[in-house]
């Protein structure tokens, strides 16, 4: 077991761990402040340090659930990158039962309750508070993502380079090693017949498949284009961890056997640059998932060898892609350099004709209405049925009432009231957190409802992952219609992200929703543990909920090594105030 021990006693197999507050702000007026932890390396050395009683012990989830008086146990240091539902060791045990030809091994596989870890995930050795945005777009601390594989195999394509104590991201990629900005301009020209850019082509929201370190998304931001970037946890180890450390919206995911956790008709563009997806296989079922996600007149951008190479099996793959896209009534609008671009023309008559010719099957209406959470991929094509034009800019989308909300009974007055409420609350949040706005970049709203919190945060230099629990009504379609991004998720399970991802996690009545309703894996302590895993050291957790839940969390927070304050803020009815918890994760380490 690595780590020094404070105190001389050892009891049985329990080893006491030194947990030290890393005091002082990383930024003291300059980019690279002190950011140095205070280590205790000898039992008699207690100066300027804080000792905790938490024990280092590999602990699994058990019933009844009991948190020791000494506080939550701390997982051993080797679990510093633990992702419960993407655990390579557990997935390896499942391999005989998985469809490897369709890469089911890359999807989420959450362990049963008794195999879940129930201990705090520690930071790695020499972890530092992340560099602030926008500098983090180009530089992150090497010790925070201490993996060299990508730099070794992708350095020549300008993904990432090592520079002393930093990782440097030049903005390149496999198909844009000379820079994402030039590549993005080229795509805009291809979409507009050399007359405009992605904005004039109507692109506001993008899904980047197999995103690498997310440089493509980073360079779309100046255009006001919002991107969800995803990639699996595969041989390109830690690519999503790099993206999130940079402050770019990303998550772990894979196109394999299940629908992606996003609503239908959510994106104007789906992008694949050497994304390692075999779109041409299995009767194009993966392309049909792209069709589901694209809005009418949305674009599929494909930068990959079959689009330009004439050797090996690439011409055969290209012919299959052409046949599959034609059957879905897509139109190939440009093919040059190393990229092909299709447009999804929403021609209902065409789709019905293709169905009559047995070239495709059309999805049932109820398939369109289901939340996309653990839903098997459908070998059918959805007709979106959309008739209303979306505003052309992000600013307009943020304020316009989404028509999809009317379908689920949310009126325009309720929408306006929610927007005003969260604008006021976000102002209070910043005042009470009392930090520079650049200290918060990655934000998650665990129960986003219709996106009012994220819309209010839009004036700050942050991005927000809006989560709509899969057990609630599908309001995520309305969130996407507002120009915001998000995903479906079930908080009985861990989220598909690395530890230490978010600077701020916002929870509005998440605990009361899951309280005693969804099984033992969704207890208050389970959700708190997942919050702790995904929030960064010195990051914030803001919790609004029923008073009895607030009281319980207030009592448990110190055992999770959270500082906690209670503030009274106006509730949604604006008739009374409610207690809101402001928790801050301490910066501690195993020594």
From Swiss-Prot:
The enzyme's E.C. designation: 2.1.1.-
Cytoplasmic side of membrane: 1-13
Localization: Endoplasmic reticulum membrane
Transmembrane domains' residue ranges: 14-34
Family, as annotated: Belongs to the methyltransferase superfamily.
Cysteines joined through disulfide linkages: none
Membrane topology qualifier: Single-pass type II membrane protein
GO molecular function: methyltransferase activity
Organism expressing this protein natively: Arabidopsis thaliana
Name this protein carries in UniProt: Probable methyltransferase PMT6
Keywords per UniProt: Endoplasmic reticulum, Glycoprotein, Membrane, Methyltransferase, Signal-anchor, Transferase, Transmembrane, Transmembrane helix
Gene Ontology biological process terms, A to Z: methylation
One GO cellular component, as annotated: endoplasmic reticulum membrane
Residues with glycosylation annotation: 87, 99, 146, 193, 323, 436, 473, 515
Primary location: endoplasmic reticulum
EC top class, as a word: transferase
InterPro entries per UniProt: Put_SAM_MeTrfase (IPR004159), SAM-dependent_MTases_sf (IPR029063)
Keyword Membrane annotated: yes
Lumenal side of membrane: 35-591
């Amino acid at each position: 077991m690595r780590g020094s021990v404070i105190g001389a006693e050892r009891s049985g197999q329990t080893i006491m761990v030194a947990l030290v507050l890393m005091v002082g702000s990383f930024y003291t007026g300059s980019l690279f402040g002190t950011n140095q932890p205070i280590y205790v390396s000898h039992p008699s050395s207690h100066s300027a340090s804080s000792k905790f009683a938490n024990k280092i012990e590999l602990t699994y989830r058990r019933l009844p659930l009991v948190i020791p008086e000494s506080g939550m146990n701390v997982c051993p240091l080797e679990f510093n990158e633990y992702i419960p539902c993407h655990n390579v060791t557990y997935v390896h045990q499942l391999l005989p039962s998985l469809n490897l030809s369709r890469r089911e091994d890359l999807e989420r596989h959450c362990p049963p309750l008794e195999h879940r870890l129930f201990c705090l995930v520690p930071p790695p050795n020499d972890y530092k508070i992340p560099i602030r945005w926008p500098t983090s777009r180009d530089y992150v601390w090497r010790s925070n993502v201490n993996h060299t594989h990508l730099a070794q195999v992708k350095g020549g394509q300008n993904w990432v380079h090592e520079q002393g104590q930093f990782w440097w991201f030049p903005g390149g990629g496999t198909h844009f090693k000379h820079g994402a900005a030039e590549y993005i301009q080229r795509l805009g020209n291809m979409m507009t017949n050399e007359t405009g850019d992605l904005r004039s082509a109507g692109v506001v929201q993008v899904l980047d498949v197999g995103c690498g370190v997310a440089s493509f998304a980073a360079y779309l931001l100046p255009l006001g284009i919002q991107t969800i970037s995803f990639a699996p946890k595969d041989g390109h180890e830690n690519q999503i961890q790099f993206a999130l450390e940079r402050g770019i919206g990303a998550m772990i995911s894979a196109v394999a056997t299940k629908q992606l956790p996003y609503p239908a008709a959510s994106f104007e563009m789906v992008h694949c640059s050497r994304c390692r997806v075999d779109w041409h296989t299995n009767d194009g079922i993966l392309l049909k998932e792209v069709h589901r996600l694209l809005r009418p007149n949305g674009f599929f951008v494909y930068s990959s060898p079959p689009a330009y190479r004439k050797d090996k099996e690439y011409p055969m793959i290209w012919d299959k892609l052409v046949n599959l896209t034609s059957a879905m009534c897509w139109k190939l609008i440009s093919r040059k350099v190393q990229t092909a671009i299709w447009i999804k023309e929403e021609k209902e008559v065409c789709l019905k004709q293709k169905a009559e010719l047995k070239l495709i099957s059309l999805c049932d209406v109820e398939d369109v209405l289901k939340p996309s959470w653990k839903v098997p991929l459908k070998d059918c094509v959805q007709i979106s049925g959309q008739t209303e034009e979306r505003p052309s800019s992000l600013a307009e989308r943020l304020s316009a009432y989404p028509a999809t909300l009317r379908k689920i009974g949310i009126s325009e007055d309720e929408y306006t009231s929610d927007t005003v409420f969260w604008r006021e609350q976000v102002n209070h949040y910043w005042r009470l957190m009392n930090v520079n706005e650049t200290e918060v970049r990655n934000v998650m709203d665990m129960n986003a409802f219709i996106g009012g919190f994220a819309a209010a945060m839009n004036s700050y230099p942050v991005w927000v992952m809006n989560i709509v629990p899969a057990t609630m009504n599908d309001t995520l379609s309305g969130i996407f219609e507002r120009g915001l991004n998000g995903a479906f998720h079930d908080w009985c399970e861990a989220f598909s992200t690395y530890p230490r991802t978010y600077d701020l996690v916002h929870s509005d009545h998440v605990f009361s929703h899951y309280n005693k309703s969804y099984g033992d894996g969704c207890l208050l302590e389970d959700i708190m543990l997942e919050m702790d895993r995904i929030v960064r050291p010195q990051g914030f957790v803001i919790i609004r909920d029923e008073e009895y839940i607030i009281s319980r969390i207030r009592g448990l927070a110190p055992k999770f090594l959270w500082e906690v304050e209670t503030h009274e803020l106006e509730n949604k009815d604006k008739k009374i105030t409610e207690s809101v918890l402001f928790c801050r994760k301490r910066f501690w380490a195993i020594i």
